[in-house]
């Protein structure tokens, strides 16, 4: 259930040893996803001795099994950020979000990472309210000099990019796109290792002993002593997450489907320009055609702790509703796993007085943004905390409900799904 198509096709992916011995470092990073590996690369390039401790395998979490969508900016409307900040700080926050895709593309080129990058993204509107939301987004972004949007007014415009009649219009965005995320992550890890970072798999941290230095107790009886610690595990930090983190993050189970490779003709009928697509619903569908011409379709999330073991029928129905031509296509793989969300869907940045840094809650928007967040954490340690300090000014609410917060979240999302269905 947890193995993605990326793992299946990337059989020769690198592996890393478990931590073999105790050692002293400048920075210890818990979590070998895009955030942690990005931070490690930036720190190693600046000359910091850095170790990454991954409890399982690199890419076993959301960084290695997501839908592969590369998106600009922050997950929610920028208004939710700018209203809490001065105009000067809002500009810094905007620039930080917009740096994410540029950072990714620069690293792909610099380190020659083979991860199937493709640019072109369709924000698809299911009804008039969605088009109004996209029009507002276009106006806001273009007021800040974003120049990658083309408004699609109806079916004739849509036909150039998508073979579906499910939508009334959309925004085509040449500044976003898609990649094979596991290949990108391992390419980034290789670059971090070459820069001098140490990466260890199967090295879970059971406890952080505060002090100077901090001591991380790792499986196998080893200890890492570090001046600075970064918590980059997002939804996978149950044993070592800080109280100010855990109450501001909710775990959501997200699912993705991969079809068998489509014929060249069928793939071209469905997505003629190869763009990635996401609709504007709260419980959205998102999809793309990968480098092997598989349809990679996401759109089934669980906001409760009920364990659903077979999401394939639901995922197939959702895909066929958009593309009737795929109703009978053979499914190769379906997988699920946890992601972390915040109340406002904006990532939560923080730092303790004794230099434990963290970021969490990319809310399904982390393929590019998590790498940028990792660089922001690293930059703060290196000496430029400008972007990091602005983002940690944002207020992040505690999820309501206390011990009942999971059913409360599920109930709230049921309302949003009904709202999507009724097109309210």
For the regions a language model picked out, list residue spans one by one.
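N-terminal Rossmann-like FAD-binding beta1-loop-alpha1 element of flavoenzymes
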Residues: 25-52
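Glycine-rich FAD pyrophosphate-binding loop
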Residues: 45-65
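Active-site substrate-recognition segment that forms the wall
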Residues: 102, 110-118, 205-207, 213, ...
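Glycine-rich active-site loop/strand segments that organize a redox cofactor
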Residues: 65-95
